[in-house]
Amino acid sequence: MDKVLVTGVAGGQGNLVARRLARAYEIVGADRTPWKERPRELRFYQLDLRKRRFEDVVRRERPHAIAHLAFIRHFEEAPAVRHQVNLAGTKRVLECCVTYGVKQLVVFSSAYVYGALPENPYYMDEGYPLNGSRTYPDVRDLVEVDTLASAYLWQYPEIAVTIIRPVNVLGYSVHSAIGRYLQLEYVPTAMGFNPMMQFIHEQDVAEAIALAIERRARGVFNLTGPGAVPLKVAIAETGGTAVPLPEVLARPAVRTMFRLGLYPFPPGAIDFVKYPCTLDGSRFAAATGFKPRFGLEEIFASLRS
């Protein structure tokens, strides 16, 4: 049985990916924090990917594939720490793949790397420029991770590098920024804007990562769910009340509250509730046969629970 190492396995999405892959592979998990929901039969290493011990684990375990989900995506951590963990951790994973003959690497990127800009076309494909850091410097690390992994994709053709850029992920287990935003009772929005947004269920994301490994998909892929809805529909369907605010007041207020630790999102996030960032997921569907199993109603219901 082939072996898969799942980094970030203690997180909600990593845990789901490990459990899905365990149906067909021997699973080894790694994370900085304890894996509280670890099935007893699966091995786990609590470690920092940036440290030498991670390389020791890869050398000893010799995984066939690595599913890399060990990223800090919230903004509660210091920016320098987030950047170090995300970028230096990914570089260490990539180097270990080259050194120890890992055959496949799946990197869990984000749709946020494209950025939310007024000139964005609807349903961007994978060739669209990565503008995320132009107006949202707080996610610059995600853009750099995606770019770094893309370079390995071409430099090391013997490794099937798969970069997956999912749209907004919601579910019972994941703790995404968009999930926290939609769980607010009164949800601030930018007055005069109501962009189309896409969502995907966490279980479908786990299935997509498993399919990427099973089909040895190689390349950069958008990952989309069952469709798109206006932001205010998503707010209503998840039980919130939209509160439109003039941007001239909202942006400085968000900047101040974020700096003081009173609001969880930096001001750059405002653009994602103004402008569209919708993706075309047809390439991944063609490469793997992926079809989302969860509809929008089930996705939104998972947030209301």
At which residue positions do the language-model features occur?
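N-terminal Rossmann NAD(P)H-binding glycine-rich loop of SDR-like oxidoreductase domains
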Residues: 2-23
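Mid/C-terminal beta-alpha module of Rossmann-like enzyme folds, strongest
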Residues: 206-267, 281, 297, 301
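NAD(P)-dependent short-chain dehydrogenase/reductase
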Residues: 152-202
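Active-site Tyr-X1-5-Lys
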Residues: 134-162
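NAD(P)H-binding glycine-rich loop region in Rossmannoid oxidoreductase-like domains
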Residues: 47-88, 96-99, 116
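Conserved Rossmann-fold NAD(P)-dependent oxidoreductase catalytic core, especially the SDR/UDP-sugar
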Residues: 92-138
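Amphipathic terminal alpha-helices
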Residues: 283-286, 291-305
